[in-house]
Amino acid sequence: MAWIFLVLLYGLLKGSRALAKKKAMATNSIMEVLLSYTVISFLLVVPQAKDAGGMETKFYFYIALKAFVIFVAWIFSFNSLKRLPVGVFGILDLSRVLFATFLGVCFLGERIGLLQLTGLLLVCAGLLMLKFKLPVFRRIFLLEEPVPVPSAKRLPASADVTTFYVVLALVSCLLNALSGFMDKILMKSVSSSQLQFWYMLFLVSYYVIYVLVKREKISLSVFKNRWIWLLAVMFVVGDKALFIANGMPQSRVTVMTLIKQSSCMVTILGGHFMFKEKDTAYRLFCAFIILAGIILGVL
């Protein structure tokens, strides 16, 4: 049962990171936030360097590959976010759940029982309801109607370009699911300290190379942004918990994926109290459906 609480901790910290990232982005650019909190996170795991040696050579390559997968996933995600309507991302969380479940069942031989399948369907339903509000729920929860954008103010968009960035966004979700799958495989042969130290070292290296090649401007004032420091601490603690959970033989990728969706509870409450977002009652209703799915999934 310990792995369930570790993954739950990861999920709650993941939701908190989303709030901290939004706060951090109010002051600094996307790349400044990504690079600085990755560098700070690496500095926080440097004390683990003494326990990070002794791996077979092939595992350095595998961890470098995992770091590259996440590096590409984040680049794809942020590029697509800049160019697509917000509504397009309604299926993103859902697609991550489906991708991770597919990998766990097909490549790790995990089985989905009736309760797990019911839990998966409830989680998917809750996530979809968060993104696409049906008229009946608009009336029950007194939700605000979306304000239509006049056609004259809409930005012209090429269908081919839009399709390209939709594919980029979905590939990003697939890569994130693949990273979780790789964690489960790697933790059978390496320790959490080894994986976290080398993963962070490779990830920082990729970002430094990217910034140098693209000649991105990074202001040193970014290190005065307290949200970035908080983001780094939550990133390190959350990943450590997730790596340890992956190293436990009884943990299952399919169930872990459901538990990670607990992050939505944090983002909903944080959005209400920190950013004064509306429709909180409806979002909590959706969150409880997701929570019910998570509970069924771990039974």
Predicted regions and their residues:
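Hydrophobic alpha-helical transmembrane segments in multi-pass integral membrane proteins
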Residues: F42-A52, A100-Q116, V171-K188, M234-S251, ...
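Alpha-helical transmembrane segments of compact multi-pass small-molecule transporters, enriched
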Residues: V39-L44, L92-C106, F202-Y206, G238-A241, ...
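Juxtamembrane helix-loop boundary signature in multi-pass membrane transporters
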Residues: M1-L8, L98-L174, A281-L299
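Hydrophobic residues within alpha-helical transmembrane segments
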Residues: F5, L9, S36-I40, L65-F68, ...
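Structural motif at transmembrane-helix junctions in multi-pass transporters
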Residues: A26-E32, F76-L92, K188-L195, K240-S262
